[in-house]
């Protein structure tokens, strides 16, 4: 759910 690139491991 977060903007792309917020986390390299998980994007929710």
UniProtKB/Swiss-Prot annotation:
This is Vespakinin-M. Disulfide bonds: none annotated. The modification 4-hydroxyproline is found at residue 4. GO terms for cellular component: extracellular region. One of its GO terms (molecular function) is toxin activity. It comes from Vespa mandarinia. Keywords: Bradykinin receptor impairing toxin, G-protein coupled receptor impairing toxin, Hydroxylation, Hypotensive agent, Secreted, Toxin, Vasoactive, Vasodilator. One of its GO terms (biological process) is regulation of blood pressure. Expressed by the venom gland.
